[in-house]
């Protein structure tokens, strides 16, 4: 094939790929927005202690809420059987029950919705040849992880139906972490489908540290889930001191000592604070190092924005403590955590660049 013909074929392939990638980017943005809403509603469900209001798992039939007085009463009677009602909410009225029911129902409905929002367009793009080969396994993997997340959600809820008045903090943290992994995976692919600046894309030090920041963000979210699961945000409501000191003296009361890291609310809050300080210092160092190594580049500018976002998140975290976990501030704190995770993934991916475009050899083959 003559070079001119090859160039025309390559140009046509590039135009088709860009059109396909534009559709995929729109779809992934919708997925990310829906995931963000799902996580926020899940946070509200936890903060309002509504997660145990629906005591059965009905993946299909459960999408329809109670429609009659008799159906509402049936749901209420099921709730009355569990320890949370018997030990905490005994005497709750039907109207009060409806309030917590709607939070959990909305969370489950959004979870079903995200499954459809992800699976149906993916099937369409796949069947119409719009999904590049390199993306097929990652996208199917994210879909499978989303399906698994549904089982994890019920596994979490079931932990609070017998012998407990709330869900296991371990299972709550697992549930949130998986949601964040799905969110991060979608962001990684979206960023890879987007145009990048070629400036210093192979700068290895910045790339490695950006990856570390992503891991730290995810770990901090995991710690935050433990805080939420144990109501540890109410352990110390002062800052920067805790019980009048930087390091309180009752952090390791339980035996063995390491169990305090997961089950002692005071220790869990302390570790979450340490994680926040570490992440703040790491992003500050990253901002300064990028300004020195790659001044004026998109990578350096993103590092500055990263530090600004971390500073806002730190302020929200402190405010959440001082306001004794006000639901609105706490939800803002959780939402900002997800925004930070997404930004950290996009920043990391920015050092790598977009997915390669087809070349003449590929087209000829």
UniProtKB/Swiss-Prot annotation:
Keywords: Cell membrane, Heme biosynthesis, Iron, Membrane, Metal-binding, Oxidoreductase, Transmembrane, Transmembrane helix. One of its GO terms (cellular component) is plasma membrane. Its EC number is 1.17.99.9. It is a multi-pass membrane protein. It is found in: Cell membrane. It comes from the Bacteria. One of its GO terms (molecular function) is metal ion binding. Its cofactor is heme b. One of its GO terms (biological process) is heme A biosynthetic process. The chain crosses the membrane at residues 23-43, 109-129, 137-157, 172-192, 208-228, 274-294, 303-323, 327-347. Pathway: Porphyrin-containing compound metabolism; heme A biosynthesis; heme A from heme O: step 1/1. Disulfide bonds: none annotated. It is an enzyme of class 1 (oxidoreductase). Belongs to the COX15/CtaA family. Type 2 subfamily. Catalyzes the conversion of heme O to heme A by two successive hydroxylations of the methyl group at C8. The first hydroxylation forms heme I, the second hydroxylation results in an unstable dihydroxymethyl group, which spontaneously dehydrates, resulting in the formyl group of heme A. This is Heme A synthase. The gene is ctaA.
